[in-house]
Curated annotation (Swiss-Prot):
It comes from Colwellia psychrerythraea (strain 34H / ATCC BAA-681). The lineage of its organism: Bacteria, Pseudomonadati, Pseudomonadota, Gammaproteobacteria, Alteromonadales. The keyword Ribosomal protein does not apply. This is Fe/S biogenesis protein NfuA. Its cofactor is [4Fe-4S] cluster. SUPFAM superfamilies: Fe-S cluster assembly (FSCA) domain-like, HesB-like domain. It comes from the Bacteria. Keywords: 4Fe-4S, Iron, Iron-sulfur, Metal-binding. Binds 1 [4Fe-4S] cluster per subunit. The cluster is presumably bound at the interface of two monomers.
Amino acid sequence: MITISENAQQHFIKLLSQQAEGTHIRVFVVNPGTAKAECGVSYCPPDAVEADDIQLPFEGFSAMVDADSKGFLEDAEIDFTTDQMGSQLTLKAPNAKLRKVADDAPLFERVHYFLQAEVNPQLAGHGGECTLVEITDDGYAVLQFGGGCNGCAQIDVTVKDGIEKQLIELMAGEIKGVKDATEHERGDHSYY
């Protein structure tokens, strides 16, 4: 679930040695599954452990995760690096804003997850977004674009060379292509 690098483990052991005995760390997500999701690490004294917490044992300490954060911390990585500028603890949780779906989840859920996790972060740089409207019986993902994507002169490139190509590769045999259901209106909001 969570990978903690050797350097980060040593850092936590050092910090925890200055705390009350039995204190561990807690890894959590505030506002999980939303665009405002934020991850954190805090001390977890023995009296703060909840009955439904998940305990991840490491050498010298445990990482406690509350049940609500579990799915959002899948594939999370914690590292501690030191360079000439100082030291830094980093926590990367690629599923904090959107819970990872199982490989055998329904096709709609897998395509939706791909769009939210991979495509929308890139489109957001242009003020754009896309949502999955439906998957047709003949295997086409129907998308609706908004924000900077609406009316953008590059939308065909984004759809055909970007999203469609990746979806066909990732979901071979299940997705045949992508259709754009957006009524594009060029305006000041359009990126290109």
